[in-house]
Amino acid sequence: VGGFLFALGSYKFSQLSHLQIMFSPFLPFMLLYLLRYLEGGRKKDLLLFALFCLAQSLSSWHYLVFCFLAAGLLWLWRAAASRGGEEWRRLAGVLLALGAVLLVALPLALPYLRAHGRLPGFERNLTEIKGFSAHPADYLTALRGNLLYSRVSSLLPHGEIGEERVLFPGLAAFLLALLAVAGWARGRKRAPADPFRRGLPLFFLLLAAVSFLLTMGPEVAGRWNPLYMIPYHLGMLRFIRVPARFYVLFLLALAVLAGYGTAWALSRVGGRGGRFPAYRAWGAVLLALVALENVNLPVPMVEVPHGGGIPQAYRWLEKEEAVIIELPTLGLGEEHRYDRLLDFLPRDPHAYSELEGLRVYFSAYHRKRTVNGYSGYFPYSYNRIFYEMEAFPSLRCVELLQGLGVTHVVWHWDLVPPEREGEYRRRLLSTPGLRLAADLGGQWILEVEEGGVSRPDDLELEALVPEVVRPGEPFNLGLAVRNPTPLPTVVTEEEPQGFRLVITDGEGETVEEERGSFRPPFFLQAGEGAVLPLRCRKAPGKEGYYRLDLHLEEGIFGERRFSFTLGVREMPVSEEPSLLEGRVEYAGTAGVVRIPAPDGLFPLDFRVTAGGDTYLLAARESREEEIARPRGLVHLALRFEKEGPVWEEQRGTLPCDLPPGQSVLLPTLVRPPDTPGRYKLFVGLTDEGFRWFGEVLVLDVEVGDGSG
């Protein structure tokens, strides 16, 4: 009964789209052999415990945490009742085994750890985690395909396969677990004399309770959850996006308790003689009841091409030395930030994952490096590439692919609307830098010609610092970078770049000194600019004038230094403004703004001037804090219109905080309309209450068809 519940319960069906969570065959055996070793002390059992712990941990980093949590809890349980030296020697053996597991797993974890250090944001923030935390009601949510609770009755809420919070294991499992606790409490004579073994139902009840609280994530009923938050702040849970997955341990504990409950119930059934004793019949009934509650039909199946069904394009690529990208992707949705904060929002996330998953599958045939893929985490570079590729085949897209080292584009005609096939054929065959290498019917293979790129240390840099800041408060500053060369710049690594800030008073005494990091620019065409945000955690506490020195330490730009006079005084801030005013001017050539191709991303430059008497906040310390406290942040706002709004209202981050009267240049990226034509572009300033203020700039924009 317990084995069926853990291996084939509804939760495993709900995780069909997450094979790494479904796959947990070694977890029960790990605990089994740990129990045997703690009871008998046989080295064979210790070795098997370590092997099963390692095997399960290597299947997913989630399971590394799950294994160590379950084993650690059992270790503490045993340690609390241990008195003799032999028992402590066994406990020491368990610690050595767990240490050996970590040593073996560490080399495989190093790439992950390097990526974590290299990619800003490669960890789960609390806002994201809360969205994937369980609620008590989720333990009564059944799969929509459940035979008993969906098709026959509608007593319970329903969830779909792939959803993370479908956690109802069936009523029988709960009842059998209650019987296990009741049997333990009554201390029946058939229970083992060994106190450790006699207390195991209570241990699994404890494991279920701990796991239940962990599935709740950062908060339980709106209150801080120390069981989750303490290890999170220690860095132990920052890579786990879905606290609800701790349900695996809850399910394991529940399954064991259900097994105990079944044994206790059957021990009360007489009639053990005969060819088919009554207790076996009742056991079969209980198993059938548990199985009935966990029947989920139909099981979704998808047939994937194989053998001769593999598309010709991938067979063609097998023979080539290539780095590829497959286009087009399924359409990307409307993201309102295209600068430093760029989420990845497919219009249909499920369909996008299916398509990219299939492309990853085909990569096993052609075995070439590819830009495509999907994950639970999308780095900024991935997001930026595919938003840029919405304009493919534009010259800007080709230059980006050249900088990335992409040699071939696999173009899928089945993803092109029939009414636009002629347009795309013309553009694909006429765009400089692309050559048709193979026409395979449903797919074209386009060769990307080699192109030059400039070096990051060729970029021009200017530090942008607020002239006046508020005493004792953090403030934002920035690095304006511009590509003065005739070649594009592409920085494929997202290694954080270090900087040092030193603030000194009029006598040369250091008042504040701190270090930080920033993300390098990703892609800049010839003449294009961008802003790299920096932050100072604390301004001087006294009003007056200071010297601020910004040192860029060794990195892609080399060593550079900037010095400024920094004023400090009290003033109203945009969180609680007095007079909120501002002006935006277009910094490009006068007349109609011409954007060569529809969709994708395109750079525009504006000059922003703060008016009124209020200090304008550009950003907060983290994205998480910006989501939690949006009020008071001031952004550039852009809206394309043609007989009504086109796309969403877009945002651009100010280069630095702006005190009244200061003016700065703001290069930003916009997403043009996806259809060629004439548009109006409204540009102004907005606070995060989505209220525009100050003067509004109106530009005439011509979006070309990509042929120019």
PLM features: what roles do these ranges have?
Residues G72, L95-L102, V256, T262-V295:
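Signature aromatic-anchored transmembrane alpha helix within multi-pass, membrane-resident enzymes
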Residues S14-I21, E128, H135, R151-L167, ...:
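Membrane-helix boundary/interfacial segments in multi-pass membrane proteins
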Residues M30-L47:
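Membrane-interface transmembrane helices that cradle and orient dolichyl/undecaprenyl
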Residues Y33, L38, C67-A100, V181-A193:
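Perimembrane helix-loop-helix junctions
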Residues L106-W184, P243:
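Periplasmic/ER-lumenal interhelical loops and adjacent helix-loop junctions
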Residues L103, P169-R198, L206-L213:
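Hydrophobic, aromatic-rich transmembrane alpha-helices
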Residues F49-F52, E86-L110, N125-G131, H135, ...:
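Hydrophobic alpha-helical membrane-interfacial segments at the cytosolic entry of transmembrane helices
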Residues N125, K189, V285-L464, R470, ...:
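Extracytoplasmic
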